Amino acid sequence: MTALSILNLLALLLYVQGKGGNKGEPIVGKTKLDKLLFLAKMTLEDSGEEVEGEFIPYRQGAYLLQLEGIIDTAQSLGILKIERNDELIYRMPEEGIKKVERVLIPKINPMLLDKVREIKTKYNDLPEDLLLAVAYLKYPDYTIRSEIKNQVFRSLLKYLKEFNELPEKLGITREDVEKLSLEARKRTLKRLGIA
């Protein structure tokens, strides 16, 4: 099996659809780009794929050493365009989509492409602090040099508190939540043929 280059992984992340269902949906923010690459690399490697590129524990968790060079290379190849707004917006231009479809996609295992699409769909719309929390919780070894670990976990606790307060804000009792949860479990068990 040939290893997937980190440049090709970047191309796939930029190419695949996100929640909007459109090819080339943008990735907003350099930290988000770095963390999506990290989560995609680790997810693929956890499933037996080999991906080149070295992430190291750094100030904001896992950091790709070659990130700047890969961004520059992707721009020079025409598969990445960076727009500047409040944040950096990384997108694949139409010519880049055509190039990736012509050159890269025919060589990629469809299951690998599905995994990359799943990562983008699941994580691209998350706020940056939640995305950091996901990466920190899934791969804690990469947080040993983090300067923002406490901030990330405080942010996660804030989200959990808001989630716990949601039923009350919506006027739903705990009993209603438990009843709905039980019904959902029963339906799931029935679908699985267990109940």
What are the residue ranges of the model-derived segments?
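Domain-edge interaction signal
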Residues: M1-A195
